[in-house]
Curated annotation (Swiss-Prot):
It comes from Halalkalibacterium halodurans (strain ATCC BAA-125 / DSM 18197 / FERM 7344 / JCM 9153 / C-125) (Bacillus halodurans). The lineage of its organism: Bacteria, Bacillati, Bacillota, Bacilli, Bacillales. Its cofactor is [4Fe-4S] cluster. It holds the Pfam family GcpE. Binds 1 [4Fe-4S] cluster. This is 4-hydroxy-3-methylbut-2-en-1-yl diphosphate synthase (flavodoxin).
Length: 367
């Protein structure tokens, strides 16, 4: 373990109606692919992302047209909106004025002190945080001159430089990212950052690649970082539909037991014993439970040999055999069902468990 269990020892930072850091769960983020000034397209994509489980969304802000679109976008969405700014402080001011819940900007890159002061003053007045985005591919010349090439120490030094600029202006609502496309470099940078400061860390492996390769690369890098107890919010960067980024991020958090509001599927690898159409059933169930916001573990198993034992780990499951299925709940056989109704019966049982969970949550809230 690292010296800091970062998820529980970071400074809590408010982003819209969420708190990132402190004792809060890791938050899933994504970024739109639309032109931000196209409000209709941007809002439509954000709503798709939210439906997939995205909790915070970022939009690019390359020009004043994009900045001026922020109020119209904000009115139509319900998750916090982060605005990505590079170099032009006037865009940051416009985005903040328009209702951005957070801005991503490196204070050392926007020029003279009065520009930084103006952005910090506006952020303070609105009570919104600033994310410092350190990227191995765009480190300052002085850092590269000192270290020769992108290193974890250089990335941390860059982060501390930007942090100091904000702290000197008495600004502390800061979130930091330490992104690199090299997995080992990213892991080292985040580990060193977690020891260097207590601001929340936004995790990401940048330029990770296509849906398949990027998923593997992100899972390797982000998984190693999360396993050290580091990270408060995460974005999986893929050259794909951003909805896929959210799916991968949620699945990754579920793998480490870090998503209390998500259902999980267990399904066995195929073998010669299987007597049902396991692959299509597993895919259908994965899609079905993806929108369930309850910590339910669902098993889809292909035979009665390993099924009963493996189903014990699940809240609900089915083991197929010779044209029928054994429906399990908490490892106990509930009943036999014909293969043709197996999936629908399983869905009904999942819905019952979800309803029980939500009813229990309401009781706890009243208590």
């Amino acid at each position: 373990m690292t010296e800091i269990t970062h998820r529980t020892k970071t400074r809590p930072v408010k982003v819209g109606n969420l708190t990132i850091g402190g004792n809060n769960e890791v938050v899933v983020q994504s970024m739109t692919t639309t032109k931000t000034h196209d409000v209709e397209a941007t809002v439509a994509e954000i709503k798709r992302l939210e439906e997939a489980g995205c909790q915070v969304v970022r939009v690019a802000c390359p020009d004043m047209r994009a900045a001026e679109a922020i109020p119209a976008i904000k009115k139509q969405i319900s998750i916090p909106l982060v605005v990505d700014i590079h170099f032009d402080y006037k865009l940051a001011l416009k985005a903040i004025e328009g209702g951005a819940d957070k801005i991503r900007i490196n204070p050392g890159n926007i020029g003279k002190r009065h520009k930084v002061e103006a952005v910090v003053k506006a952020a303070k007045e609105k009570g919104i945080p600033i994310r410092i985005g350190v990227n191995a591919g765009s480190l300052e010349k002085r850092i590269l001159d000192k270290y020769g090439y992108p290193t974890a120490d250089g990335m941390v030094e860059s982060a501390l430089h930007h942090i100091k600029i904000l702290e000197d202006l008495d600004f502390h609502d800061i979130i930091v990212s330490m992104k690199a496309s090299d997995v080992n470099l990213a892991i080292e940078a985040y580990e060193k950052a977690a020891k260097a400061f207590d601001y929340p860390l936004h995790l990401g492996i940048t330029e990770s690649g296509t849906l398949f390769a990027g998923t593997v690369k992100s899972a390797a890098g982000l998984g190693a970082i999360l396993n050290m107890g580091i990270g408060n919010t995460v974005r999986v960067s893929l050259s794909a539909d951003p909805v896929e980024e959210v799916k991968v991020a949620r699945e990754l958090l579920k793998s480490f037991g870090l998503a209390s509001n998500a259902a999980t599927l267990i399904s066995c690898p195929t073998c010669g014993r299987i007597e049902i159409d396991l692959i299509s059933i597993a895919n259908e169930m994965e899609e079905y439970i993806s929108k369930i916001r309850a910590p339910i573990k669902v098993a889809v198993l292909g035979c009665a040999v390993n099924g009963p034992g493996e189903a014990r780990e699940a809240d609900i499951g089915i083991a197929g055999a010779r044209g029928e299925g054994l429906l399990f709940r908490k490892g106990e056989i509930v009943r036999k069902v014909p293969e043709e109704t197996m999936v629908e019966e399983l869905k009904k049982e999942i819905d019952k468990i979800a309803e029980e969970y939500f009813a229990k949550q309401k009781e706890l809230e009243k208590a």
